[in-house]
Amino acid sequence: MVVIQNIIHDSSINEYDLSNTLQEVIKELDRGESELLIRLVNETEIKNLNKVYRHQDKLTNVLSFQSDLPIEIDEAVLGDVVICTQVVLKESIEQHKSFNNHLTHMAIHGMLHLLGYDHIDTKDAQQMENLEIKILAKIGINNPY
């Protein structure tokens, strides 16, 4: 199950489509009945979360928070992905991308972090990007890189 919390009340975002797309990606990744929360926030909230949890006092597009539920419950709960739609919009304009496609990409990127993927070193980054490209292609979104 994918839950979208659109706390900024951005009516341009089709929450239903985003939720369904991410649910299909979860199935594609063999995560079955996993639960995922996507929280759409403003710049103030993402900057505060980035400062508190990553000790970086700056804006970012997406943050991922793994579930802190007990291990026996945790299998089905992926965690939370927090996305700043203002940053994603700016990036989509700068990179000449569709806002909805870039938003979907950032949600998938955050979800992959919850599944253990990272991009700290070049090898891991390439593996994560390749998986993102493959997933995005299956849902009709061109290579974002």
Swiss-Prot record:
Keyword Transmembrane helix: no
Molecular-function annotations in GO: metalloendopeptidase activity; RNA endonuclease activity; zinc ion binding
Record key words, sorted: Cytoplasm, Endonuclease, Hydrolase, Metal-binding, Nuclease, Ribosome biogenesis, rRNA processing, Zinc
Residues holding Zn(2+): 109, 113, 119
First-tier enzyme category under EC: hydrolase
Keyword Hydrolase applies: yes
PROSITE patterns referenced in this protein's UniProt entry, alphabetically: UPF0054
SUPFAM superfamilies reported for this sequence: Metalloproteases ('zincins'), catalytic domain
Single GO biological process annotation from the record: rRNA processing
Cofactor: Zn(2+)
Cofactor note: Binds 1 zinc ion.
Compartments it resides in: Cytoplasm
A Pfam short name: YbeY
One Gene Ontology CC term in the entry: cytoplasm
Similarity-based family: Belongs to the endoribonuclease YbeY family.
NCBIfam families, A to Z: rRNA maturation RNase YbeY
Purpose of the protein: Single strand-specific metallo-endoribonuclease involved in late-stage 70S ribosome quality control and in maturation of the 3' terminus of the 16S rRNA.
This protein's name: Endoribonuclease YbeY
